[in-house]
Structure formats: C-alpha cells, structure tokens
C-alpha cells in the first residue's frame, strides 16, 4: 500500500492511466482531467489528516435511470445505467473507532463514534446518518468494521437525479468492505446502503440506485422479492449506437427539499394497493385494478389512481426496454423512453410540484427537447425522483451543439453533461 504522496507521484507519471481509462475513457483530455482530480483529492486528504499515511482510493459512480420511474419501491422492474460521473474517495484505516469523512464542497467534517450505533437525535437527513447506518449495517451482517479517515470529491450533481446519495453511500460501503475484508458482494452492499438511507437518513428509497452504483453497467432488476432482487447486467458497451449521445441537463433546482413529495408518490401507490389487499402494487393483480377503478377513485383520489396507472404501464414498458436493449434495437428502446417520459408527466405527476406551478424547470426542458428531437430518432424523459433536477435525452450527434445551446439558454452555461455509460460499479481504483 502506498502513501498519499507516493500515489500522487505515480498518478502524475501516468502509472495509473490504464485504471483511469477503464473508468472514464482513454482520451488524453479525459486522462489529464482525472489525473488532476485524483491528485487534488490526495492533496486534500493530506491537508485534513496529515502526510505520510498509507491510503487507498475508491470510486463509486452515479447513475442515470433508463426506465422504471418509481416502480422499484412497488416491487416492480427497474432499469438504470452507471455513468462516468462519480465520487472519488481517498481513505486510510484507523484504529480509534471513529469514522471521519470530509467531503469537497461541504464545510463540516463528519465524525462518527462507532460506539454509538443507534440513530442520533438531529442527525437524520444529514450525511453523518448515512455513514453511521452503513457501519451498523455491516455489523448487523456479522462484519466487525472499525474506523477510517476519508476525503471525498464528487462530480455527481447533488440533488440532480443522478443519485449523488447512492454514490456517497457506495463510497462509504466499498471503503468498509475493502479496509475490513468483509467480502460482501455488490447486491449485499446495496442493501446495506438502502438500510442506512431508510432507517438512519429517513428517506423511503427503493434499491435501484444503490444496486446500479454497486454493480455498474446497465442493470435490469426485478424487485418482486425486494430482499433478494433478481438482477441482470447488460454490458454498457454497445447500448448506445454510433452517432447517439446520452445528454443529461441539470435544470439547477435541487431535490434536496423534496423528500415529502417523493414519499407521497409511494404512499399514494400503496394506498391503492391496500384497497386491493396488497402492501404494494407489485402484489396486486392488474386486471382487478382496472375493474375497480370507480371505487379506487372514490377511496384514494384521482392522483393516487393515476400514479397506480403509471406503475402498471411503466412496469410493462421497463421489461420491453430491457428486451430492446438485449436485442440491440435502439429505435424500439427510444420509443419506449418517450412513452415513459409522458407517463411520468401525465400520470405519476412528478415533473413539477403542484404547490409551486411557477417553477417548472423540468417541464420547460422537456418541451424544448421535444421541439428539437421529435422525429430525429432521439428520445427524452425526466429521470429519477422528479419534481426538480435533471432530464435525460438521447441526442443525435448532429444536433448536440443545437441541443446544448438551447438548454444553456434556459439554465445557464455548463448545464448539459455529455455522459458515457460505465461498466464498473463501486471499486477500489488504487
């Protein structure tokens, strides 16, 4: 194991270029940026924790949701892809029983006393709660983890729908798994992270985000049994045809204050399920749902019913998207992407907040996307939890400049991210 200074020197000399190219691509422009980024993270680690310590460096990717918008938490299907935007963590094991994490862009140093295993008062919705919950998740699985010191630098847009939280969680999890030799596989790490987010952070999330960051590539998941989801990895290479680029646009409105809106989607879907003798919609026979629409409208309200309609139709679409990708039929996949986006807008109703109709960044971005991309073979949709954050578009290369210019006119310079899908999940890089 090398010291932070030794790793900085090795990175600058190009000794880690192959490892970086496997994650981000091998162009000199990309490698130069990542050398600088990793070197800066190592320098910051030294600033906070001192020089001369032996360290390891980890990466956990963000994800883009490709299908299955708000279906995973109802025990349906999910489809997502790991992306090249990621969190990098420099970490060194310690023996004092504390986890310390300093994250770029945040003033506070998270300090977790591992003797305090229970959720702490006032800590929910803060990163410290995730760290504490992940450590306790390992211990509940029989792995006696201890302390470490870490510095993290994330390029995953916070509150944007690319799941910065899952990247952070998986960064912490892969550190503990590696530093303490726990040997847990990627799905097990994802479940620990979900436990931390649900129980300690206080957000009722599904599992797809964590699974995608853990496994990498394009991931199709069947959550009929959420404790042991069936997953299928579709290799990232070849998913996008030549001449088509994945573009994610940040509308620069954050998800960070929208936990209540996300929870309402789940609660309303489950209210419909309860009227049909299920806990979640995945336990409900679709035929019976359609037969009992009048009663469901009366008991649950129209929005809950529309969100249930979205679930059933989106679930079928997600399976069809998976089949299209496996068959290499991007045209069919793109048509399904558009239908998914319309369903999220019209039925799931998570494109803007009804309580704040003046602020509709996602709606505006989708409207402009449709005006540019309709009939071109491209596609567009909102992604992630919704209400704010990012939209996703598959843009023909001939239209990239026009498309990005239109988005930047609305949301400012640098709002468009041209992404690649990433084959590797959370991993120790060096």
Where are these regions (language model features)?
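C-terminal nucleotide
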Residues: 1-63, 88, 92-124, 220-381, ...
């Amino acid at each position: 194991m090398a010291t932070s200074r030794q790793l900085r020197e090795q990175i600058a000399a190009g000794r880690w270029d192959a490892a970086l190219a496997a994650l981000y691509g091998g162009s000199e422009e990309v490698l130069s940026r990542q050398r600088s980024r990793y070197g800066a993270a190592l320098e910051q680690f030294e600033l906070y924790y001192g020089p001369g310590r032996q360290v390891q460096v980890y990466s956990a990717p963000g994800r883009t949701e490709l299908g299955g918008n708000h279906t995973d938490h109802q025990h349906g299907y999910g489809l997502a892809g790991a992306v090249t935007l990621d969190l990098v963590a420099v970490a060194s094991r310690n023996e004092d029983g504390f986890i310390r994490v300093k994250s770029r862009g945040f003033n506070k140093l998270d300090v977790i006393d591992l003797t305090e295993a229970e959720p702490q008062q006032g800590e929910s919705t803060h990163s410290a709660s995730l760290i504490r919950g992940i450590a306790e998740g390992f211990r509940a699985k029989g792995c006696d983890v201890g302390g470490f010191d870490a510095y993290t630098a994330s390029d995953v847009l916070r509150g944007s729908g690319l799941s910065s939280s899952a990247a952070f969680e998986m960064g912490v999890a892969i550190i503990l798994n590696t530093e303490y030799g726990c040997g847990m596989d990627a799905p097990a790490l994802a479940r620990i992270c979900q436990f931390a987010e649900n129980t300690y952070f206080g957000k009722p999330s599904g599992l797809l985000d964590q699974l995608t960051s853990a496994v990498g590539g394009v991931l199709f998941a069947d959550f009929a049994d959420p404790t042991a989801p069936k997953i299928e990895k579709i290799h990232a290479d070849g998913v996008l045809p030549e001449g088509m680029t994945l573009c994610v646009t940040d509308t620069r409105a954050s998800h960070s204050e929208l936990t209540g809106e996300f929870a309402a989607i789940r609660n309303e879907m489950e209210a419909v399920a309860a009227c049909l003798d299920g806990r979640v919609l995945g336990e409900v026979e679709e035929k019976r749902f359609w037969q009992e629409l009048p009663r469901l409208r009366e008991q649950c309200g129209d929005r809950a019913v529309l969100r249930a309609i979205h679930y059933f139709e989106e679930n079928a679409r997600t399976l069809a998207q998976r089949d299209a990708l496996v068959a290499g039929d991007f045209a069919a996949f793109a048509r399904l992407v558009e239908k998914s986006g319309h369903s999220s807008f019209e039925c799931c109703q998570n494109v803007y907040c009804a309580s704040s109709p003046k602020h509709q960044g996602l709606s505006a971005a989708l409207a402009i996307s449709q005006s540019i991309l309709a009939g071109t073979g491209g596609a567009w949709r909102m992604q992630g939890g919704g209400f704010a954050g990012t939209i996703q578009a598959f843009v023909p290369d001939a239209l990239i400049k026009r498309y990005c210019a239109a988005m930047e006119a609305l949301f400012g310079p640098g709002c468009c991210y041209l992404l690649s899908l990433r084959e590797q999940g959370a991993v120790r890089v060096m």
